[in-house]
A protein has these predicted regions:
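Gly/Ser/Thr/Pro-enriched helix-cap/hinge segments flanking short amphipathic alpha-helices
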Residues: 3-167
């Protein structure tokens, strides 16, 4: 969570006293707060936007945070995990990623659904990428493009980063 209040009110003054809060999801819809000391996420000032990308290609989400009247702040994820990123390029063979759905099926019959959207941030756009916290025990991955076409990813070739460049 990044504080997102850039309009000061006369009676309260500027709203840039927070330092932000990292929340970790457990896959069931519940989130656990991580202290700033543990996460290293300390955004001083009036943070206005947060975009997520895999900037160093390790399969983990990295943050780029916009600060009102300040410089961008970059946070490279240092946690060592068995994660996976799936990147959908903007225009693979004429297809657009906005609205694409990605289903991740596990061997225990559980399913994760991800949908790529555009917008939702203040003058910012995250990369067309999803992150899967644990790539072990994945049975299959299906991508449904906005035009209805579906692709199945061969899970035998899972690495830390997958791109659908030629689909």
């Amino acid at each position: 969570v990044v504080q997102n209040f850039s309009g000061p009110q006369r009676e309260t003054g500027y709203m840039h006293g927070g330092i932000s809060q990292l929340l970790l999801g457990d896959g069931s819809g519940l989130f656990t707060p991580v202290s700033s000391l543990e996460s290293g996420l300390i955004v001083r000032g009036d943070a206005t936007s947060l975009t997520i990308n895999d900037l160093n290609g390790d399969g983990s989400p990295d943050f780029l945070i916009g600060v009102n009247n300040g410089n961008y702040e970059l946070y490279i994820n240092q946690f060592k995990t068995n994660s996976l990123s799936i990147r959908l390029p903007d225009y693979p063979k004429g297809r657009k990623f906005a609205g694409s759905k990605i289903w991740v099926y596990y061997v225990d019959n559980s399913v994760q659904l991800h949908q790529l959207n555009i917008g939702g941030g203040y003058l910012s756009q995250s990369a067309p990428i999803i992150f899967i916290g644990n790539k072990q025990n994945i049975d299959k991955i299906m991508v449904e493009w906005p035009d209805g076409l579906k692709n199945e990813l061969d899970v035998e070739f899972l690495s830390s980063d997958i791109s659908f460049l030629d689909k």
